Amino acid sequence: MAKLTKKQKEAVSKIEKNKLYSLKDASVLIKQIASAKFDESVDIAVKLGVDPRKANQMVRGVVALPHGTGKNMRVLALVTPDKEAEAKEAGADFVGLDDYLQKIKDGWTDVDVIVTMPAVMGKLGPLGRILGPRGLMPNPKTGTVTMEIGKAVTEIKAGKIDFKVDKTGIVHAGIGRISFDADKIMENAHEIIQTLIKLKPTAAKGTYIKSIHLTSTMSPAIALDPKAV
């Protein structure tokens, strides 16, 4: 393990060992221990009591963070010509179809989200091996395959994110920036936690939310009390 810097040691010392923090206290503390010279991302990791290998225990969905992510989401709209103006007006960063499909085939994936139309999905199939591992494949369940292209782009730009439990049963999500007020960090975290609770699979047994950790790009993780969120 790499040696901790002086600032990182100071940050660790401010976190009480074995303590489970309330979401409110953790949101204040995460700002106090941040030491980087850039605006760090604030992330949440929620360990769920599910077996994601089983289809009836897969947890995925979307959430509109009340205060956005603080990140400028780069959106590619893969649409037919009749939808291009709608996508551009909504703020899509890249708009088109065949030219961008070719760029992706050539290895270009410099975007955060891709939205498209049902009629175009057939063309994206062969690109699954490129887009899939990067989490960029559009999906009707997350609202990125739709005829309402303008609405989809607007929502993403406003802070709508999609999430999916990984193979270890953890949901990771970026929920803001360290420059956010503690209340905004808390409210964004609360929104995604409540969304996860609503999505609890009926097949999931035992404790559903096993642990929650709040962290920033360069800081150690703060353990939250799942009962105090």
Curated annotation (Swiss-Prot):
One GO cellular component term: large ribosomal subunit
HAMAP family in alphabetical order: Ribosomal_uL1_B (MF_01318_B)
Gene name tied to this protein: rplA
Role, per record: Binds directly to 23S rRNA. The L1 stalk is quite mobile in the ribosome, and is involved in E site tRNA release. Protein L1 is also a translational repressor protein, it controls the translation of the L11 operon by binding to its mRNA.
GO molecular-function terms, A-Z: rRNA binding; structural constituent of ribosome; tRNA binding
Protein name, per record: Large ribosomal subunit protein uL1
Keyword Ribonucleoprotein carried by entry: yes
Pfam family, one: Ribosomal_L1
Binding partners and assembly: Part of the 50S ribosomal subunit.
Family: Belongs to the universal ribosomal protein uL1 family.
InterPro entries xref list: Ribosom_uL1_bac-type, Ribosomal_uL1, Ribosomal_uL1-like, Ribosomal_uL1/biogenesis, Ribosomal_uL1_3-a/b-sand, Ribosomal_uL1_CS
CDD domains with a match to the protein in the record: Ribosomal_L1
PROSITE patterns: RIBOSOMAL_L1
Gene Ontology biological-process annotations: regulation of translation; translation
Highest classification ranks of the organism: Bacteria, Pseudomonadati, Bacteroidota, Flavobacteriia, Flavobacteriales
Organism whose genome encodes this protein: Flavobacterium psychrophilum (strain ATCC 49511 / DSM 21280 / CIP 103535 / JIP02/86)
Keywords: Repressor, Ribonucleoprotein, Ribosomal protein, RNA-binding, rRNA-binding, Translation regulation, tRNA-binding
Coiled-coil annotated spans: none
Superkingdom field: Bacteria
UniProt KW Protease keyword: no
